Amino acid sequence: MPEGHTIHRIARDHGRLLVGRSVAVTSPQGRFASDAALVDGLVLDRIEPYGKHLFYEWSNGLVGHVHLGLFGKFRVHLGDVPPAPIGMVRMRLSTDVATIDLAGANTCAIGTRDDRDAIVARLGPDPLRRDAKPALAVDRMVRSKQPMGALLLDQSVISGVGNVYRAEALFVHGIHPSRPGNACTRDELEQLWVTITAMLRRGVKDNRIVTVDRRLVPVPKGKLRRGEATYVYHRDLCLRCGTPIQTVELGGRPCYFCPHCQPT
């Protein structure tokens, strides 16, 4: 599932092609057809990312909601002539400069601002947003008996963090993923927020996940293989000390950690 940096990057890149323009909204697959008709031909005012969610604000006040889930994917085609759809395209957004197709998304719907606000109200602060309130996430973690590896995947605690960033951020701070939130100090959790924010921002800039310190670890250009730009995630050995990496199941996903650098 795409992590928060991908969603913010999509909002930025797609916004340049769609925002401020009249957009033809269709559903080649048909599942989104009735919703598409509500905004077809209208001007798109804004694309707002929040955690792993995308919200499309239309000129008539309606708001589109997309959550990619595990299998959702966008395809961007530049030019003023829309190509033939490839596969099961749920939503197609076409302007005079580009066509953007969405397939396989967990959620693709048109609603109201109240619908959008209700979704956001269930989410924790998003480190990539200017209006984020870190204290809310820190308060929830420091009072919780849940393990840190589960808390960081809980989108009601902190929004946008996925399996890679949780493992890497916990490693940087030497926190074992099974340590309860209330066994961490407030200062530890505040610094963890800072690290997560920096990692996510770098992800938006690079359009890929690189968590290692580039000053110490050379990162190859182009497409990365798993483990080439991480300390513990999807690695056999810890990048720092060489200890075999272990995993623990938390939040329904395996969390990678180094038993030497992240003692219990």
Question: Language-model segments: which ranges?
Answer:
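Structured catalytic/nucleic-acid-binding cores of DNA maintenance enzymes
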Residues: 1-264
